[in-house]
């Protein structure tokens, strides 16, 4: 990378930094040479009231999984049966983190993680589907950065079972957003943006039930007092039914064959100005904050998968007989 490109990338990253952060950071203090044990111990315990909410809901989740979700069928066919989706929507699984005033369940992040753990222990495809929808999909950036009008327009739809996706990565752009090629050009009257570009590796985007996408795109550069310009990345809610939105390819994988991960193109898509989340240039900050929630959801699901592995191993070592006894009784395993 040449010096100019590096400077632009650094300026963009600094401009996207979450400057309004008010809490003391444990990691930042470590780098300063101060080990703030009080920031991590004692670990905050879930309140009895909140835990009961989670306990009661997990009973409903287990019933839906056992009655309506066949993980083997989903992985073999690569699709989610309509009956399974209807059952999940009926108990609010698509709106766990959406506030109650917008039709969701308003769960704490702890209960959300507990639910993902249970679903992950049962069906990895399903937990990926749900997590991508509300950990990094449209509900999360709207919760944190959306206007009241945006929340009332979209969150009830998403809580009822409409699916969303998140579009950041491009064929030539991954961790370097300064090179982003998707562009949102404002119209002369300022009432809309014209969106053009390509995105890939977007989970849920090729699912026909996905109606909304959080899209990151370049908007006009920000000019500094010294005359230099910084690329602006902004975030928009885009409806898949709008003219010019085309889902072009669904990716296939060795595992998780049920996830609808793929590519989407935008050709002269007219996006109303009121569909921008946050302010111009805040898109990268919004994306990073949104991805942080995804980084909590994924390990919660992975813990569930690990628990399922342990259960399977325990069953096997107690049922598999070798040399006159279960293999779990042999010294190498016991």
Positions of the model-derived regions?
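Short helix/loop capping segments that flank catalytic or ligand/cofactor-binding pockets
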Residues: 106-107, 175-177, 203-205, 223-227, ...
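Glycine-rich beta->alpha junctions and the first turn(s) of the following alpha-helix
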Residues: 246-334
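Short beta-alpha junctions and helix-cap segments that line functional grooves
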Residues: 154, 169, 179-180, 200, ...
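A gly/ser-rich beta-alpha-beta helix-loop segment of oxidoreductase catalytic cores
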Residues: 163-186
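A short core secondary-structure module
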Residues: 192, 196-246
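Amphipathic, small/basic residue-rich leader segments at the start of a protein or domain
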Residues: 1-133, 140-159, 163-164, 175, ...
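Short Gly/Pro-enriched turn/cap motifs at secondary-structure boundaries
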Residues: 172-175, 204-208, 226-227, 253-260
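Structural beta-strand/beta-sheet cores of well-ordered domains, especially the beta-sheet scaffolds
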Residues: 162-164, 180-182, 191, 211-215, ...
């Amino acid at each position: 990378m040449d010096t100019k490109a590096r400077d632009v990338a650094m300026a963009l990253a600094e401009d996207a930094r979450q400057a309004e952060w008010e809490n003391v950071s444990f990691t930042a203090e470590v780098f300063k040479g101060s080990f703030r044990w009080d920031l991590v111990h004692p670990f905050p315990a879930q309140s009895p009231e909140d835990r009961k909410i989670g306990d009661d809901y997990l009973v409903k989740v287990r019933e839906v999984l056992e009655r309506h979700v066949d993980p083997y069928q989903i992985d073999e066919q690569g699709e989610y049966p309509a009956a399974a989706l209807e059952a999940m929507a009926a108990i609010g699984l698509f709106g766990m983190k959406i506030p109650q005033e917008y039709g969701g369940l308003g769960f704490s992040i702890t209960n959300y993680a507990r639910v993902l753990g249970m679903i992950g222990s049962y069906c990895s495809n399903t937990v990926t589907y749900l997590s991508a929808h509300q950990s990094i999909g449209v509900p999360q950036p709207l919760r944190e950065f959306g206007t009241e009008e945006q929340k009332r327009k979209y969150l009830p739809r998403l809580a009822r079972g409409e699916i969303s996706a998140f579009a950041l990565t491009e064929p030539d752009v991954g961790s370097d957003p300064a090179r982003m090629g998707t562009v949102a050009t404002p119209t002369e009257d300022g009432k809309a943006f014209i969106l053009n570009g390509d995105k890939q590796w977007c989970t849920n985007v090729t699912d026909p039930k996905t109606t909304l996408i959080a899209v990151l795109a370049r908007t006009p550069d920000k000019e500094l007092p010294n005359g230099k310009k910084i690329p602006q990345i902004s975030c928009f809610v885009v409806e898949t039914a709008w003219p010019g939105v085309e889902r072009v390819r669904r990716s296939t994988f060795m595992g998780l064959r049920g996830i609808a991960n793929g590519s989407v193109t935008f050709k002269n898509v007219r996006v109303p100005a009121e569909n921008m989340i946050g302010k111009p240039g805040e898109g990268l900050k919004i994306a990073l904050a949104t991805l942080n929630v995804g980084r909590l959801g994924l390990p919660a699901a992975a813990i569930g998968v690990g628990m399922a592995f342990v259960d399977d191993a325990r069953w096997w070592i107690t049922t598999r007989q070798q040399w006159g006894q279960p293999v779990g009784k042999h010294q190498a395993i016991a």
